[in-house]
Amino acid sequence: MNDTSRTTAVCEPGCSNGVTRRAQAPVGTSFKHEHLSSILADGLKDGFFEVHAENYMGAGGPPHRALAAIREAYPISLHGVCMSIGGPGALDLTHLSRFRDLVTRYEPVLVSEHLAWSSHGGTFFNDLLPLPYTKATLEHVCEHISQVQDAIKRPLLLENPSTYVAFASSTLSETEFIRAVVQHTGCGLLLDLNNVFVSATNHGFSAEAYLEGLPLEQVGEIHLAGHSEQRDDENELLLIDSHDCAISDPVWHLYRDLVARIGPTPTLIEWDSKLPAWPVLRAQALSARHITAEEDVSLAEEVSHAG
């Protein structure tokens, strides 16, 4: 069986920033039931598939039969969207228990959640909402991540958000906040490059400068996705993290630069609505694989020269 943990860690010759470069990292896509038969017929060799945990919290039925069929052939990544890691209230223990049970049942190679909140006072929101970056929020987030990691008995990967508003009360930058969370909890980072580009465009900061501020040595997975364009009330460009189209050229550029810096890393193509035919989604994954393969060759040459 394939295993996304089968990577070779190699210290980059002459590297002074402590970043570890990795070879032979797999590329995967979101798993959608509409694609099941096509995947089983012509899937992704040495790839993996990611599922949203909340779609599988029932005991059985068609969702689990489909997921079991995929799990027989491929590793899976379990991606939570409703844990409300960033909320000020206590975690929903029933939800956490179901999340833990999925980890036990399917043994995913990667487990992740969002730096966001989606519930408060018994009310649940169908969105991933931003949070103020303060010391008080940092304490809540670290406590929640530690609670999740204790439950699943493994490190969690935390995904950077896409945002459309910022809080005036924030006393830390987003990258400072994420770095502190990683330092205090030992969690890893799921680096969503489309989120970086969306937020950078919406708030007017440099995506490259943002990446410089992150603990890149802790990146355990990369997400790539498409976004849509809208106009706000002042007719300014507003990007929406819509996951309903192909990956944009600027995001591919960020990906190529990131892989050149940290080495090939497990990469997931997200496409959640306006689903294309499987060959279209598969082609996006193969494009990412081509970039990582180029870096594999570069890394092998560096290791050979270093020897």
Swiss-Prot record:
InterPro entries linked: MbnB/TglH/ChrH, Xyl_isomerase-like_sf
Matching HAMAP family: UPF0276
Annotated family: Belongs to the UPF0276 family.
Taxonomic lineage: Bacteria, Pseudomonadati, Pseudomonadota, Betaproteobacteria, Burkholderiales
Gene3D superfamilies membership: Divalent-metal-dependent TIM barrel enzymes (3.20.20.150)
Native organism: Paraburkholderia phytofirmans (strain DSM 17436 / LMG 22146 / PsJN) (Burkholderia phytofirmans)
Name of this chain's protein: UPF0276 protein Bphyt_5128
Pfam families hit by this protein: MbnB_TglH_ChrH (PF05114)
